[in-house]
UniProtKB/Swiss-Prot annotation:
GO terms for molecular function: cyclic-di-GMP binding. This is Flagellar brake protein YcgR. Keywords: Bacterial flagellum, c-di-GMP, Nucleotide-binding. GO terms for cellular component: bacterial-type flagellum basal body. 3',3'-c-di-GMP binds at Q121, R122, R123, N124, A125, F126, R127. Changing R123A: Loss of c-di-GMP binding. Interacts with the flagellar basal bodies. Monomer. Binding of c-di-GMP produces a dimer to monomer transition. One of its GO terms (biological process) is regulation of bacterial-type flagellum-dependent cell motility by regulation of motor speed. It is found in: Bacterial flagellum basal body. Residues 121-234 form the PilZ domain. It comes from Pseudomonas putida (strain ATCC 47054 / DSM 6125 / CFBP 8728 / NCIMB 11950 / KT2440). Belongs to the YcgR family.
Amino acid sequence: MFNESDAPQPPKVLSTPLEIAANLRQLQESHDPLIITFHDRSHRFQSYVVHVDRESNTLALDEMIPRDGEKFIENGEHFRVEGFHDGVRIAWECDHALKISEVDGHRCYSGPLPQEVTYHQRRNAFRAALKLSQLVDIILDGAHLKGNGAMRGKLLDISATGCKLRFEGNVEDRLQLGQVYERFKAGNPLGLVDTMVELRHLHYEERINTTFAGVRFHNLSGQAQRKIESFVYQLQREARRFDKDDY
């Protein structure tokens, strides 16, 4: 639905255990990917919330991707966590040592719940989902793409600032979180050529043998920005007209 609540909101700082646990649990239940950045280090790592318990004041994060980020956890280095849930940015600082343990037989990092969480609703960047019958073909390529040849996939949804992509099979080992790929192309009717994108989210869904990637547009030209905004506006109009309740 489209109303004034979709307008941008200033960030809020959540400080009560109830609010913090509720928002972290949303990230857990939706399996929303997290971006982890260690202070004074350029690499980004991906994880997920796997356990939230307000009663015992504990939080557990899934094993990091790539795994080599674990050595920074072992060193007790501080880091920042950032996730997105339904257009809301949820972020916090981890400034204490975490314990490497297991939850349901899977490796994880556990510690206390954060004392503060930043909650920032960013609905102003309308994200338009494409119907399955209308998915746009995309090509992802660039100097830092691992493996042989460009990657071909589908555009699932798009906003003025980024888009979600789908690739057949497990392609996680070909991509690096935080990396910029300079040759992203999208077929008609969007028609983007050699656009720069930054990889923000990456998740392989084994059940359907599909990899999902979230990218943010990087240094867009004026022409590309206008193409994207026009395409989003077109999708927005169609969504209002045909599928109000679905968007």
